[in-house]
């Protein structure tokens, strides 16, 4: 465990500092999480779950960490240029891994709704955060989750009380800002009580072209009869590594839509684990990745049908160019008591060059006999027949290829239930295919 040793030493030397600049609720599980990290280490390809991405190697370089919580000299409102200008949102920022609340414009949210710093909310409402924090993100099973829990000092809490509807979408912008190679450990806690409804857009941007390593753990609790949409849009630099673990628990008759879109990145590893714990729960899990050069995108999903009468729909699409690498592994588990399960899983992929590589592993484990489940995966190239037809109608070959690729990913974009975001994504994807979106576009400093 050579890679891990530098972080073991670092934690031993700085644990008091880490705790000093955090909150008691976050500090309580820190020692146990660190012990789990010491035991597990960082995942390597030897673990089946990580066989397409060697996470361990990305922790080898030296990175700076802001454990003393020094102020970052940046005003997000001056440098951030929203890529969704026509969508009215309640806008918030996280700079590196700290919630930005300096000179924050007042946002009018419904009574009882909380959106703010995890550290501050944990101090103001310790019982609320304690009830949920770390309950889904099991540090005993994943080394990255254990590492994040040991080092995370702040993050975001989004709490919606019972039967409250948040009409205006919430937009959370994660900005990476540093002058040296830098590591951040982000944390997001989302709680929707019974009958609540909300929509959240999370955007990842990098202001500087240094090497960034971002670990992220998101926990989502969706109570009975809730409706929750969460969209993640990644537009960072090729020198950015993102390792994200998302945990979701749904109660009876909840409806959750998760859509993660990687438009530009360096290396991305996303893990999504969904537990359908109440009858009538429905999860729609979607993803899209567009990669070129040496970019790497790996999505690993798990949907656990633990009770009867639940529905899961899963759709992931990749377009890979140059020497880029994509991976998708999706498990749907139907437990013995989960009768009347309805589950569909689809993974479709386009490799635009011979050097692009796509690995796909759909998997069903069914232990109930009265279910309706299907899965399918394909890896191929553009339809030559369609290309020939379009060229015969006077469309240039390059333009025809762009149109076919755009049509291919359009199915994922159309799952978005925010019209302004959907319209903007159509434009951003077209620009990405035309090579006009080849770096972070979210910050005015990136010109």
Where would I find each of the regions flagged by the language model?
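Short, low-to-moderate order helix/coil transition modules at the start of elongated helical scaffolds
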Residues: 1-217, 225-227
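Conserved beta-strand/loop scaffold segments within soluble protein domains that form the structured core
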Residues: 111-114, 124, 128-388, 392-395, ...
């Amino acid at each position: 465990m050579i890679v891990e040793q530098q972080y073991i030493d670092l934690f031993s030397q700085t644990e008091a500092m880490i705790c000093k600049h955090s909150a008691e609720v976050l500090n309580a599980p820190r020692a146990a999480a660190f012990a789990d990290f010491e035991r597990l280490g960082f995942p390597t390809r030897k673990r089946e779950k990580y066989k397409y991405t060697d996470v361990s190697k990305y922790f080898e370089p030296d990175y700076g960490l802001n454990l003393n919580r020094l102020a970052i000299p940046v005003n997000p409102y001056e440098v951030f240029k929203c890529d969704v200008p026509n969508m009215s949102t309640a806008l918030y920022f996280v700079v590196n891994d700290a919630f930005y609340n300096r000179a924050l414009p007042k946002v009018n949210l419904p009574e009882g709704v909380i959106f703010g710093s995890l550290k501050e909310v944990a101090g103001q409402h310790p019982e609320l955060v304690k009830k949920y924090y770390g309950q889904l993100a099991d540090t005993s099973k994943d080394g990255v989750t254990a590492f994040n829990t040991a080092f995370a000092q702040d993050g975001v809490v989004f709490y919606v009380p019972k039967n409250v509807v948040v009409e205006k979408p919430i937009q959370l912008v994660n900005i990476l800002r540093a002058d040296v190679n830098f590591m951040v450990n982000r944390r997001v806690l989302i709680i929707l009580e019974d009958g609540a409804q909300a929509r959240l857009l999370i955007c990842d941007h990098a202001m500087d072209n240094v090497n960034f390593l971002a670990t992220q753990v998101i926990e989502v609790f969706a109570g009975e009869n809730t409706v929750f949409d969460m969209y993640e849009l990644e537009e960072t630099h090729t020198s950015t590594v993102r390792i994200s673990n998302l945990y979701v628990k749904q109660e009876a008759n909840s409806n959750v839509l998760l859509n993660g879109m990687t438009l530009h990145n360096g290396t991305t590893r996303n893990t999504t684990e969904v537990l359908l714990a109440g009858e009538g729960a429905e999860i729609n899990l979607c993803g899209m990745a567009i990669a070129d050069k040496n970019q790497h995108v790996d999505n690993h999903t798990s949907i656990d049908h633990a009770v009867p009468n639940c529905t899961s729909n899963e759709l992931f699409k990749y377009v890979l160019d140059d020497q880029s690498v994509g991976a998708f592994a999706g498990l749907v588990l139907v437990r013995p008591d989960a009768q009347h399960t309805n589950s569909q899983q689809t993974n479709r992929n386009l490799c635009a060059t011979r050097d692009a590589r796509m690995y796909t592993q759909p998997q069903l484990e069914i232990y109930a006999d009265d279910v309706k489940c299907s899965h399918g995966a394909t890896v191929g190239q553009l339809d030559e027949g369609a290309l020939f037809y379009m060229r015969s109608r006077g469309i240039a070959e390059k333009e025809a290829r762009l149109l076919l690729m755009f049509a291919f990913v359009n199915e994922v974009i159309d799952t978005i239930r925010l019209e302004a975001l959907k319209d903007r994504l159509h434009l951003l994807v077209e620009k990405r295919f035309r090579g006009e979106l080849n770096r972070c576009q979210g910050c005015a400093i990136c010109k």
